[in-house]
């Protein structure tokens, strides 16, 4: 098979059937086999992108979250952090919590974190025995809101429902955002690995859908700080629950998102 691939590559170079790629300023493709004018462009927009949102477009008009703007929005970010071996072996959860604590959060933003799912936390005070709920205060500080939120597996959809319910009741807002932090396996296995319950499996897309339906909160976006969760199946599943999906279709590095500048 390798010989076939190599021979095909050599043949392509000799015959010039490959597209030329210019890497000087991004990607630029020139197709020598046929002219671009032969494509049907009847459905393409002739209006240039000016960077301004068009509220009359069919997609933006379908948004379910109302954004007030002018610093009038109250935003509650729910971060569901199942630490797993990413925390116990590599401190990745602790690093990300520190990044969040170092962020400059506006007074109208509530960042609430649910912790659990690992046999060892590297930040003093975070329990490995119980799941807990924290509020990120900024200036390097986090505050424990719920010292004992039970010890259920974080891959259990009921645990996610309980967290969303807690946040929506105690931190009401006109914009809700959910970030699910851990391992991810896309359509195959869904989200999460709870190191304390290695036989509990992961949370499938169907179970995530069930949890979000039961919680009945409309999200501005649902994000997965996890591998392989950006796919059509996940997007379709979330279409009734959120306006946007933020995720990676590729494997992420263990450290995941950089929160200090993004929050």
What annotation goes with each model-predicted range?
Residues 9-13:
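Hydrophobic core
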Residues 83-87, 117-121, 182-188, 195-199, ...:
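Solvent-exposed loop/turn segments at secondary-structure junctions
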């Amino acid at each position: 098979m390798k010989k076939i691939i190599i021979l095909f590559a050599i043949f392509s170079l000799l015959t010039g059937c490959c597209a030329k790629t210019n890497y000087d300023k991004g990607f630029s493709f020139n197709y020598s086999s046929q002219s671009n004018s032969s494509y049907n462009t009847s459905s393409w927009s002739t209006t240039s992108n000016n960077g301004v949102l068009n509220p009359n477009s069919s997609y933006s008009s379908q948004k379910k979250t109302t954004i007030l703007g002018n610093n009038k929005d109250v935003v509650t970010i729910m971060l569901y952090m199942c630490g797993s071996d990413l925390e116990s072996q590599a401190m990745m959860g602790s690093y990300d919590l520190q990044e969040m604590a170092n962020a400059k959060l506006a007074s109208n933003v509530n960042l609430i974190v649910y912790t659990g799912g690992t046999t060892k936390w590297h930040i003093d005070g975070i329990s490995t025995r119980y799941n807990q709920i924290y509020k990120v205060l900024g200036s390097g500080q986090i505050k424990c809101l719920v010292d004992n939120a039970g010890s259920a597996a974080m891959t259990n959809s009921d645990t996610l429902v309980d967290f969303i319910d807690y946040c929506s009741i105690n931190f009401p807002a006109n914009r809700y955002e959910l970030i699910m932090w851990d391992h991810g396996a896309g359509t195959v296995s869904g989200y999460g690995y709870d190191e304390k319950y290695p036989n509990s499996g992961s949370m499938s897309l169907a179970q995530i859908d069930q949890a979000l339906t039961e919680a009945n909160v409309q999200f501005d976006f649902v994000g997965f700080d996890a591998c392989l969760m950006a796919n059509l199946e996940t997007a379709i599943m979330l279409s009734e629950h959120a306006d946007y999906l933020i995720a990676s279709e590729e494997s992420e590095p263990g450290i995941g998102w950089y929160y200090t500048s993004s929050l």
